[in-house]
Amino acid sequence: MSAADITPSNRVILAHYDSYSAALLFARWADGSLLWPEALPESAMAMPAPQAAGPAHDGEAVRQALIERCGLNGGEVVHVGEFAHWAQTDAGPVRIHLLRFTTPDAPKALIEALGARFHHLAQLRGAAMSELLLLREAFNLIVGGSGGRA
């Protein structure tokens, strides 16, 4: 399945966690969105996970699509499977994934070349509230749970 097939029904939060300094950074894209490849539509509503998610929503397929489309090193980014959020849009269900860089330092130059910058959660005020709530869930999972060790 190609990146073009995957992206309409998925969004990705990109994060980097430095366990030494306990710094958690999130990518913010040039359009102000915190989601790749684009923000959710304003009409999107949170929903429970569907009974049967198809292959287009598979976390590894989404990770591979991001690697392919953005030229990332697959050995440096992991899918955090415990993060399971969904939104209903006019086009159908959208899964929001959390991908975390495992490099010792945040790949700031790489992200900037893609049109984004890394920020701490507190620096993201003014972003869409729905996206900030998703980042708060990611923060709780990574800092307070097992997501930082994945």
Predicted regions and their residues:
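Amphipathic alpha-helical regulatory segments at dimerization interfaces
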Residues: 2-4, 68-69, 84-86
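Localized chelating/binding microdomains
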Residues: 22-23, 87-92, 114, 130, ...
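An acidic, glycine-rich, mixed-charge low-complexity segment common to nucleic-acid enzymes
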Residues: 1, 31-32, 76
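A structural signal for well-ordered alpha-helical scaffolds and beta->alpha junctions
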Residues: 59, 63, 90, 128-132
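Nudix hydrolase/Nudix homology domain
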Residues: 2, 35-48, 106-150
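Conserved Nudix-box catalytic region and its N-terminal flanking loop in Nudix hydrolases
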Residues: 18-72
